[in-house]
Amino acid sequence: MISKRIQEQLKKGSPIREAFEEGQRLAKIYGAENVFDFSIGNPYVEAPKKVKESIQKIIEQNPRQIHSYMNDAGYEDVRKKIAESLNRRFGTSFHMHNIIMSVGAAGAMNAAMYALMDVDDEVMVMRPYYPGYTSFILNWQGKKVEVDPDPQTFQPDFEDFESKITERTKLVIVNSPNNPTGAIYTEDTIQRLAQILEKKEQEYGHEIYLLSDEPYRELVYTGETLPYLTKYYNNTLVAYSFSKSLSVPGERIGYLVIPDEVSESQMLIKAVKMTTGMIGYVNAPSLFQKVVAECLDEKANLEFYQKNRDVLYKKLCDLGFEVVPPSGAFYIFIKAPGGDEKRFLEKAHECNILLVGGSFFGYVGYARISFCVSHEKILRSLAAFEKLAELMRE
């Protein structure tokens, strides 16, 4: 018999996967070109050519070693190159030992949380948030604490944030650019979060860690370079994934940054290397560690997403929908007219538009649109959104 904990999770299901499967069903009825599945954040553009070239070169150079075990933290030469790249781009001072290769950002976060959390420790998440955080916290028997946003900007509500920090607070997760809103945390936001956390660390006499989840760091439409959070708050960890920047989500490759400034950093580095193995990952994928090291200055054609964003955002605004301006990532967070999320999703379904409700992201009354699809699909969907706007006015 499966555990009660997992039984509860199975009952909840995954609206994203359910919408994806519904899209496949509708495509058989109406034709794939007439179904507009915006439910899943699966990168559409191809990986850079250098990814393929690197795979071929690396396999030919050492066909035996590339499939072998290595240091739990990953290949030393790879970690050294990543540290140097970060230092060059963000003015940091990382070394090889500060980088632990991981099975994507999710693997990095889980290894860090396993190393840091005791039963009933509290983890703060900023609404709306990636729903996987709920599972990660549950994995390590923690308690999720939700922080409200400013509904106009989707920056954190600082009063709510500070009021909910307790003696049991161990971690604060931030995600910028944000999934599902596309909002980017400003430098002022980062500074204010850091000030509050420093104050609360002194008040409670123990560390509170800031865990920055950064799979969308390169997906920015405003031309700005995002603040690198380790420069603002000492007890900051960074979980990074190459899934979006290189369009390789299925390869599950990323890393965790543990700066020297983190309290007892050397002990934490040892702990995360251990928990990586205890979770069952052993080490990050061998081949793709080497591949990403060759592609640190490469990016997929991320400008493609801006073209989709611009067309769809303008259309939705023209139709009178209330939309969060997406500054990054590849999502649009749209407010359900009248706040009726259920009716909005149902009417969208009638138009063969598949979305994910905001309640799945901890924020009722909205829906997420993933615009990481072909540009042709975006253009074909505009008439369907016109129909949806008409239905919502009835």
Predicted regions and their residues:
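N-terminal small-domain helix-loop-helix segment of the aminotransferase-like
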Residues: 2-104, 111, 157, 295-298, ...
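Alpha-helix termini
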Residues: 25-31, 89-91, 196-208, 260-266, ...
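Short beta-strand
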Residues: 35-37, 239, 322-327, 359-360
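Conserved core of the PLP fold type I
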Residues: 63-205, 217-232, 378
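PLP-dependent enzyme catalytic core of the Aspartate aminotransferase-like
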Residues: 84, 88, 162-163, 170, ...
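Conserved core segment of the aminotransferase class I/II
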Residues: 231-306, 389
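Conserved glycine-rich beta-strand-loop-beta hairpin in the small C-terminal domain of fold type I
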Residues: 286-293, 305-317, 323-335, 365
